[in-house]
Amino acid sequence: RQAICTAPGPQTAKLLEGFRPTLAMAAASTSYAPCLAAMVAFAERPTVEWCAASIQDGPLSFVAEDNARPGHQPALAPSRWILHASASWSAEHIEENPEVFAPLMLEAFGQLPGVQDLDPPVHLRGHRWRFALVEKTTTSAAQVEGTPPVAIAGDWCEGPRIEAAWSSGVRAASAIRKALT
């Protein structure tokens, strides 16, 4: 049967090696930066002068109040915040347990300008995204290989944005359809 593999490049390379070698080599040529994330909830909204921030220096690169997003629960208890670590900080801490890095990220949140006196959270959870930020896309033009046809798709095929992932998926589906006719 035909298939489209949309896993991150390094995972796709392992899945396809020895099975679809041209696609495996294309996938292996990609590289990623990791991103550690934390979700923190407070019983009451902390004193924070903003609801989202992109941060240039330090352990964190992005912070957002989840309750403030359109279509989400209004800013009532619990107050939920998403913390993303910088690529360099994430790379340094990627092998740590989430129970170790999430409190460090919470501490960094408490030290940001405009954040005052954080109460202890009612919830704190960390998550590892090993393949979060595409640093190098594949240089291969190969999209589909073999019989039955297997195609590759993802942000690592065309560019590090969701639009590129979508476009790549459409192209992969078209390549599969063409290979079947």
Where would I find each of the regions flagged by the language model?
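Anionic-ligand binding region
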Residues: 48-83, 91-93
